[in-house]
Amino acid sequence: KMNPAYIKKDELENDYWNITFDDKLKTIEKIITKKNKKILDIGCGPGFFLQQAKKRKWNVLGIEPSTMAANYARNKGIQIAESTFESFCLTNKEKFDAIHSKFFLEHVRDPKQVCNDCYDLLNTNGVICFEVPNDFNILQKIVTDKLNKKQYWIAPPQHINYFSMTSLQNLLKKSGFKPFYAESTFPLEFFLLFGFDYIDNDKIGKKIHNMRMNLEKFLQSTGNNQVKRDLYNYFAEKGIGREIIVYAKKIKA
């Protein structure tokens, strides 16, 4: 079920999220250069990513099982398949040039099957962009070892898969994709090591989230967004960052 407060929060932070959406879409558009292009967002929620894609002249479709989120997206003019990804794959006849998914792969029973299905849904040379939490990373290890914290990122029953940069790339390779770019998001664990203990403290959690947003918005508004992207690309190579984002291309079978 979708929490209305979550939608409200995303609305309020929309200018920030649009920067991250543009980053992703620009990377995808380096490969997908044709005029008439179509993108699928798996678990699109209220459709904010697809709104941004639409502004960039993409034809868009979102898959979303939550009726509330699906209706919200439809009201914003986004085409929605209100179903699970599995059900969608059984009946869908369309092909896509790109597939985006954020915070989906860690919840599914069979991530390999999802990647195989995505391969089938894409046109040749199509692009996939997956974002997942970066768990059991070196900073988290330092936090548990040095600050004596529990493994706070383990979240059953919601999260049943845990990924590193390497394991996510390997998963995609096994399904016939060739990863071509990776980046991470700000390593929120830095804040724990700075002394801001946001674990189980929503007030501090909110504060550090705002700090991270401010940093990225300042870089963007001063024409330094590429500095951020290069930094996050480097973080990804080193295996740090709260989330990891992998871009991969469907190669001919």
Enumerate the predicted regions with their spans.
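Conserved N-terminal segment of class I S-adenosyl-L-methionine
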Residues: 1-102, 111-115, 184, 209-220, ...
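Hydrophobic/aromatic residues located in beta-strands of well-ordered beta-sheets
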Residues: 60, 128-130
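Short catalytic micro-motifs in class I SAM-dependent methyltransferases
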Residues: 102-109, 131
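A short glycine-rich, Lys/Arg-flanked "PGG" loop and its adjoining helix->strand segment in the class I
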Residues: 112-127
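Feature marks short, surface-exposed loop/turn motifs that line or immediately flank catalytic pockets
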Residues: 125, 136-138, 186-188
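Short, glycine-/aromatic-enriched active-site segment of Class I SAM-dependent methyltransferases
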Residues: 130-161, 166-173, 196-197
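Conserved catalytic loop of SAM-dependent methyltransferase domains
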Residues: 180-213
